[in-house]
Amino acid sequence: MSALTKIREGLAREDNTHVAGTLAPHEKEIHETPEVVSEVGPDHDKEATAGAINPDDKGNDSDVPSEDVQNGVKEIQAITLTWGKGSLAALLCLIWTLFLISGFRGSFYLVLVPYVTSEWSAHSLMTTIPIVSDAMTAACYIPMAKALDVWGRAEGFLLMSGFATLGLILMAVSQNLATFCAAQVFYSVGWGGMIYAVGVLAADASNLRNRGLAFAFTSSPYMITAFAGSKAAAAFVIDVKNWRWGFGWIALVLPCVTIPLFLVLKVNLRKAFKNGTVTKTTRNRGFFGSIWWAFNEFDVIGIFLFGGGLVVFLLPFNLAGHAPNGWSTGYIIAMIIVGFCTLIFFGVWEYWLAPVPFLQGRFLLDRSVVAACMIDLTYQVSYYTWNYFFTSFLQVVVNLGPAEAGYVNSTFQVVSGVLLFIVGFLIRKTGFYKWTFYFAVPIYIFALGLMIHFRAPNQYVGYIIMCEIFISIGGAVFILVMQLAVLAAVAHQYVAAALATLYVAGGVGGAVGGAISGAIWTNSFIPQLIKRLPESEVANATLIAGSIVNQLAYPVDSPARLAIQESYGFAQIRMLAAGVGIASLFFIWVPMLRNIDVKKLKQTKGLVL
């Protein structure tokens, strides 16, 4: 069956699992202490959380998929009940390879984007791109979750990989900043959705107890790409002298992994249909009926209100410094007002008017899910307030080459690749995860504050790497445990939706962080540059700010280069100070988490990790 046929059938399926305010029949009453959730009732009815969200009961090792779940969940359960160890190993290897490509993609992006924007004299607008792409990506996670649950994991994954490939091709052939920004939206939505779908697959193919190790496994390729990716990206800048081939290479390689992964899922699903493990359930709504159903089910109006409102509201904070009259410019004021009103109307639409709300109410009422989402939001904002210009800072201020700057900025990938296995193993042994935040949060905030001290021009790079290592320790724990906390609080049928809610929070955080970073940059770097440049170079301030190539053209220790470095330091200190202030919110969110014992819970069926 083709993917297109599958999608058409998915549009015709009846969605029998809309969120209800009451518990499902299989959900049992539980009690919790402030720190540990305990279960009551027989062993086969143990649940994870109280309130509106409950996971599957412990004894769900039956040889048939659950009946009270959506079609995509039923199909993935049928796959895990049907496949053998070879198929499971093939899936895990393909996921690992996909994350290897993702690591190269991330390294390429960090190193190449400063040169991409500089080609069009738009280095100062570097944060504009992620504001738009992150906001639109955040708006697409919830519909993506519904696609995975209604159409199926394989179809949703293939659709997103298609968007990612298209975006990469458009980035490679773009000839101006506007085209590159549009390509970045396709790429970001597709890549983010693809990685999200793989995250859901990793949850489908692993027990909750081993999920930390599963996520650590998928992150391990980053230890390779932290060095190889940065070196390869530098080669495109220095040797090939064409950044477009960096994105083009990823576009060529990506289908070589995504198509086999899609086929592994489809082949095993076909076996499940043949064996009678699962049967096809369809309802004929007709073409226009299916279109109308999809329009409402995927909340298309909500997507555009949320994504568009967020973009229009956040962009002025980045553009005001370039506007003719600054903050008093008419279109800057209009964008802020229109964006804010659009976000208000989005709330009104979702609460009173939307046929199927964008976010599920049951998740918004569970304190553990809310806490994990707020931790993710806080982490992304605090991290991206300073990180977008970090690679440029390392080259211009610390005098590193593109490859070496990529190595330093990839410290997170190396540290997390090792640390995640350790944390995942400890969680597997203890069954609890909340304790990891008690050392991760102080380390992260301390390192972020310490980084402020090492932002002076020509500072010893070893101190910066030391701070990066500590920041990476905290960040790696956040990324792993946030996902685990959300997944431990829901049943298998809600895994995709719960992860999507977490990803929405992260996407919004990235967009807000980019807006703060851009606002600080445009309102501090350029004024300081004009103030500090030698008289003979003041007329070139705009050209210098717009291109990293122009910045690097001035010799080290020359008056102009020192002025540029001091301006970078001035802006970076304020970016980091904002990050530290925002990170202090962790102390509010962490106590809200429930300390669920994942050793006693089981969500999946069949042969899993």
Swiss-Prot record:
Protein name: MFS siderochrome iron transporter 1
Gene3D superfamilies the record matches: MFS general substrate transporter like domains
Region (Disordered): 1-69
Family, per entry: Belongs to the major facilitator superfamily.
Molecular function terms, GO-annotated: transmembrane transporter activity
Name of the encoding gene: MIR1
Main function: Major facilitator transporter involved in extracellular siderophore uptake. Gibberella zeae produces extracellular coprogen-type siderophores as well as the intracellular siderophore ferricrocin. The role of extracellular siderophores is to supply iron to the fungus during plant infection, and the intracellular ferricrocin is required for intracellular iron distribution and storage with a crucial role in ascus and ascospore development.
PROSITE patterns listed in its UniProt record: MFS
